[in-house]
């Protein structure tokens, strides 16, 4: 909340010659007693292309300021023509009326100013060298541009409106970088945890697969052992059968299977019994 409010500004001498002083009747309201004076300042914008040509026409301190509505007449000197580029002397420019409290600007009023020659002949055929004595100004007082700023007053805490300090932006950037680094580290840790979590089941799965492969190999070995045992048993049975046949041949003096008509016959158990 602003303690001082600008109620109105009246341009007293308008239009006027370029060399005439500026006069403003300023009305404002003060809501609370102030410890410091108000500083009013008028600035003439000499060029729209560079701030180097700006001229501070005048500044005054007003105070002590009583509570209530106050009015005063502010008079400022005209700008120096030699400090203004010749190409922009007779043209449209801007003047700025501002007020500050304790070095802090809280209100600014801007006006457009049209500078032109005072005769039709000079306006239609301007001379190469500007004739300042024939230049008049016309302030567009009906269309001011008012800008207000929040500042610290006497009854407000400094913490609410901290002053600008050099290097604060750099510190904030450093803090942001640290936060980003912490976020990246956190993201890396989370990624590592996820990788660890994904490795866990895979590792178990690989272990299970390894055990299954070992079981399969063991089964294959067992099967091979069984096949070898079966082959050994068959070989033993074959050997026993050959021994039995040889014994029968020794007893009868002729082979067991007698050939009839050139065909071999296999004796049945009955035939074997009869022969004995």
UniProtKB/Swiss-Prot annotation:
Compositional bias (Acidic residues): 155-197, 211-254
Assigned keywords, A-Z: Chaperone, Chromatin regulator, Coiled coil, Nucleus, Transcription, Transcription regulation
Annotated protein name in UniProt: Histone chaperone ASF1
Residues annotated as signal peptide: none
Keyword Lyase set for record: no
GO CC terms: chromatin; chromosome, telomeric region; cytosol; H3 histone acetyltransferase complex; nucleus
Quaternary structure and interacting proteins, as annotated: Interacts with histone H3 and histone H4.
Subcellular location: Nucleus
Family note: Belongs to the ASF1 family.
Lineage of the organism: Eukaryota, Fungi, Dikarya, Ascomycota, Saccharomycotina
Source superkingdom: Eukaryota
Protein encoded by which gene: ASF1
């Amino acid at each position: 909340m602003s303690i001082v409010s600008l109620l109105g500004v009246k341009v007293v001498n308008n239009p006027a010659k370029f060399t005439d002083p500026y006069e403003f009747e300023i009305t404002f309201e003060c809501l609370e007693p102030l410890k410091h004076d108000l500083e009013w300042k008028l600035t003439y914008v000499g060029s729209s292309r560079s701030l180097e040509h700006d001229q501070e026409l005048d500044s005054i301190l007003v105070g002590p300021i009583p509570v209530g509505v106050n009015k005063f007449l502010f008079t400022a000197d005209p700008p120096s023509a030699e400090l203004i580029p010749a190409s922009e002397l007779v043209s449209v420019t801007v003047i700025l009326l501002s007020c500050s409290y304790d070095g802090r600007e809280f209100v600014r009023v801007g006006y457009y100013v049209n500078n032109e020659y005072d005769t039709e002949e000079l306006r239609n055929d301007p001379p190469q060298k500007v004739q300042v004595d024939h230049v008049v100004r016309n302030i567009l007082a009906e269309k001011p541009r008012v800008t207000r700023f929040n500042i610290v007053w006497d009854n407000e805490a400094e913490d609410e409106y901290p002053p600008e300090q050099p290097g604060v932006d750099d510190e904030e950037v450093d803090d942001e970088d640290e936060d980003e680094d912490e976020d990246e580290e956190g993201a890396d840790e989370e990624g590592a945890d996820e990788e660890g979590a994904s490795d866990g089941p895979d590792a178990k799965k690989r272990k299970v697969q390894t055990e299954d492969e070992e079981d399969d190999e063991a089964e294959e070995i067992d099967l091979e052992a069984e096949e070898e045992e079966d082959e050994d048993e068959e070989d033993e049975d074959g050997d026993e059968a050959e021994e039995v046949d040889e014994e029968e041949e020794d007893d009868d003096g002729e082979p067991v299977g007698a050939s009839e008509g050139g065909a071999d016959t296999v004796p049945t158990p009955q035939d074997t019994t009869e022969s004995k």
